[in-house]
From Swiss-Prot:
Residue numbers binding substrate: 413
Transmembrane feature ranges: 4-24, 42-62, 68-88, 117-137, 151-171
Cited Gene3D superfamilies: 3.30.1120.170, Alkaline Phosphatase, subunit A (3.40.720.10)
Membrane topology field: Multi-pass membrane protein
EC number(s) per entry: 2.7.8.-
Site (Cleavage): 214-215
Name of the protein described by the UniProt record: Lipoteichoic acid synthase 1
Pfam families the record matches: Sulfatase
Length: 639
């Protein structure tokens, strides 16, 4: 037993230690994983160890020298995965995915430049293999020893156990890590590069399977639905924004109850209140709801730019990032010659934006790397809203007009922290820190927005621009109902929670008078609304929403979980309420038909995403977006 440990097991232990060391060092030196806090650092140290024990432990099932050779082969394959990601990250500032490998638009674009991003110190990543080969040559006695399969199985099971311990603490630090899949960086940071590769492979296989069995016949029911639900444009508004810039402003986690709300007698959002009452000739939709699922912000982006719902689980931005889309920026480009851009104070890989934006057809993506991310400018998820808006002005000025620009704010994001010097409003006093802090960050966002309007005017961009402002999703979850009862002065029942899913939608169209519009609608309706304002008929495109200004608008608002709201009925968990009074009602033929329609709408939208059906939807005057035509940031710098 002593010799067994000395030779065979010591070779395994040496392989594990060397492999762990090079992987951990690569995490620290090659990748920008954004590790924060002790827990994340411990997990970063731990995750290469669990991977090494499991994968290298598989070789222990073989006998003698063959075991060591298999261990070397496994080590080499894992090193290949590591080094391929290192090179890819140096070029694209992102991790490899299986779709990347198949796409010439990403890996192929590296071309001869791959040699320019190799470095002399890269030999370090193969040093452990050289050491292990030397040990194998100089210690031939390895071939004499056999290990019991029971012991080898115990090692492998230990690797699996270590992974689940890793996963437990990762999920504790970042809930819904795998179901929502925020960012490839997060998966690598928490679970490791090798587990990320497996995860990506499984996700890709699932997507490819669904896609492989789809055909153009599957699109027929979708086309029938969208054709029958088409709402023709309102002549008063159709084409009223033609040729004008569109500036779409995303208010992070902003709910409509903040509009006109006073905290201790003081308005929380005085500028937005002014806009909501027709200031700057803004039209305010006060019965507008978010329709996001687990994908939250990414679902809102997807829905508003494509008029399709996010998925029932996870984020379509991540899992369906390679799909074909008939998006608003692509249509505006091909029909009216618009330049499109996203401006955001977070890094581009979050929510897989750097990949899916290429499939949506955004010409430019200004992420955190293009802004001043010094400590005084950053809080919570990224860049503070005031410097974000100020620094965005020259970026907007650089765009060829007309442009469609999407600006995504961040400061009003959970946990709603704010530096004391930036706070102009005292916190609420419910005792729930999340709710109490929410009002401070909402006020800061309101001030930043007012500043942005002034800066747009000073830059000469205001007069010729449609400005759309929207809240992406709720900021306060049901976990805070006690505090919200105190804030709103009413019990937060299931009915009231559904009403609380209202988020603001404000649209300023130059030359059109503003005011309050009581139409019921949701994020699914934004794309056809903007198309009609631009004078582009939405009828031939696959839209699950309808124009908010149309007299034929469908005012049934479907939530991602199958609940719904109309001006007359609210349905939560199949219980029907009167929308105006909250009184419980008995289900009737009308509510049953509404439920059937909502389920059909969600199901058909899911089918479009799961089966990538828009690749079959051919239009004479619309060309499918080619992602290889788009390049963002760092990947263009290497020649």
């Amino acid at each position: 037993m002593k010799k067994l440990f000395s030779y065979k097991l010591s070779f395994f232990v040496l392989a594990v230690i060397l492999f762990w060391a090079k992987t951990y060092l690569s995490y620290k030196t090659e990748f920008n994983l954004g590790v924060k806090g002790t827990t994340q650092e411990i997990l970063l140290i731990f995750n290469p160890f669990s991977s090494a024990v499991f994968f290298l432990g598989l070789a222990l099932l073989a006998k003698g020298r063959k075991s060591a050779i298999i261990m070397l082969i496994i080590d080499f394959l894992m090193t290949f995965v590591l080094y391929a990601n290192i090179l890819f990250y140096r070029f694209f500032d992102d991790f490899l995915t299986f779709p990347n490998i198949k796409q010439s638009g990403n890996v192929g674009n590296m071309g001869d430049g791959i040699f320019s991003i190799m470095a002399g110190h890269d030999i370090f990543y193969f040093l452990d293999i050289i050491i292990l080969i030397a040990v194998l040559i100089w210690r031939p006695e390895l071939k004499e020893y056999k290990m019991k399969k029971r012991f080898a199985s115990l090692v492998i099971l230990s690797g699996i156990a270590l992974f689940f311990i890793n996963l437990h603490y990762a999920e504790k630090d970042r809930p819904q890590l795998l179901t929502r899949t925020f960012d490839r960086n997060y998966i690598v940071k928490y679970l490791g590069l090798y587990n990320y590769t497996i995860y990506d492979g499984v996700q890709t296989a699932q997507t490819e399977t669904q896609r492989a069995y789809a055909s153009s016949d599957d699109l027929t029911s979708v086309e029938n639905y969208t054709t029958s639900h088409y709402a023709k444009p309102n002549a008063e508004y159709f084409g009223s924004a033609k040729g004008k810039n569109i500036i779409k402003i995303h208010l992070e986690s902003f709910q409509s109850f903040l509009i006109d709300y006073k905290l201790n007698g003081e308005e929380v959002t005085p500028f937005l209140n002014k806009l909501a009452h027709g200031g700057e000739d803004v039209t305010y939709f006060d019965n507008f709801f978010h329709q996001t699922g687990q994908g939250k912000t990414s679902d809102a982006e997807l829905t508003m730019d494509n008029s399709i719902f996010g998925l029932p689980e996870g984020s379509a931005f991540v899992t369906k990032g390679e799909n074909t889309y008939q998006s608003l920026p692509a249509i505006l480009d091909q029909k009216e010659g618009y330049t499109s851009a996203v401006l955001h104070g977070d890094y581009k890989s979050f929510w897989n934006r750097d990949q899916i934006y290429k499939h949506i057809g955004y010409d430019k993506f200004f992420d955190a790397s293009t802004y001043d991310m010094s400590d005084e400018n950053v809080i919570n998820m990224g860049l503070k809203d005031k410097p974000f808006f100020t620094e965005s002005i020259p970026k907007l000025e650089s765009l060829k007009q007309p442009f469609y620009a999407h600006l995504i704010t961040l400061t009003n994001h959970y946990p709603f922290n704010l530096d004391e010097k930036d706070a102009s409003l005292k916190k609420a006093t419910t005792g729930d820190n999340t709710v109490d802090s929410y009002f401070q960050t909402a006020r800061y966002l309101d001030e930043a927005l007012e500043q942005f309007f002034k800066e747009l005017k000073e830059a000469g961009l205001y007069d010729n621009s449609v400005i759309m402002i929207y809240g992406d999703h709720n900021g306060i979850s049901e976990n805070h109902n006690r505090a919200m009862k105190e804030i709103l002065g009413k019990e937060i029942t299931d009915y009231q929670n559904a009403q609380n899913q209202r988020v603001p939608l404000m649209i300023r169209v130059p030359g059109k008078k503003g005011g309050v519009n009581h139409t019921y609608g949701g994020e699914i309706d934004v794309m056809p609304t903007l198309l009609h304002l631009e004078g582009i008929d939405s009828q031939k495109y696959i839209n699950f929403g309808t124009d908010l200004f149309s007299k034929d608008h469908d005012d049934t608002v479907a939530f991602r979980n199958g609940d719904f709201v109309t001006p007359k009925y609210t349905s939560v968990d199949n219980i029907i309420y009167d929308t105006k009074t909250g009184e419980k009602l008995k289900a009737n033929e009308e509510t049953k038909n509404l439920k059937t329609r909502v389920n059909q709408q969600l199901s058909l939208s899911d089918s479009v995403l799961y089966k990538d059906l828009l690749r079959f939807h051919k239009l004479n005057d619309f060309k499918a977006v080619d992602p290889s035509d788009y390049h963002y940031g760092k990947e263009k710098e290497i020649k």
